From Swiss-Prot:
Gene of this entry: rplO
Highest taxon in the source lineage: Bacteria
Segments for region (Disordered): 1-65
GO cellular component terms, A-Z: cytosolic large ribosomal subunit
Protein name according to UniProt: Large ribosomal subunit protein uL15
Family per record: Belongs to the universal ribosomal protein uL15 family.
Originating organism: Heliobacterium modesticaldum (strain ATCC 51547 / Ice1)
GO molecular function: rRNA binding; structural constituent of ribosome
Keyword annotations: Ribonucleoprotein, Ribosomal protein, RNA-binding, rRNA-binding
Quaternary structure note: Part of the 50S ribosomal subunit.
GO terms for biological process, alphabetical: translation
Amino acid sequence: MQLHELKPAPGSRQKPTRKGQGIGSGLGKTAGRGHKGQKARSGGGVRPGFEGGQQPLQRRLPKRGFTNARFKKEFAIINVGDLDVFEAGTVVTPELLLERKMIKKLKDGVKLLADGNIEKALTVKLHGVSEAAAEKIKAAGGQVEVM
């Protein structure tokens, strides 16, 4: 088989319907739009969420809560188990993790979580450390410093 011999699978492609092309096509005259009315006109139809003048659902329900999404800090995540690749006594910094490609980018900082185990004593200097992760690092004889 060559490139010019490729064909779509049978039944996978359907001919487009040509609306308004005569009564024999099945979609002539009104072209499937019915008679008159807003939806029959060109450019006609109602906006999404419009309920015909009835108070729309979005306005019937009360406003609730508050979001700080624009200013939310997003951390690059790394787990305690991932740090086992370093030799004992290493100072683990965001720059080192980036250099070793253990995180893709710094974002708003790096946070250490407690998944996995560690046997080596490391000094960890990151932007965030969970309590459980800090306990595991200290139990292995390491130090934790939050930047």
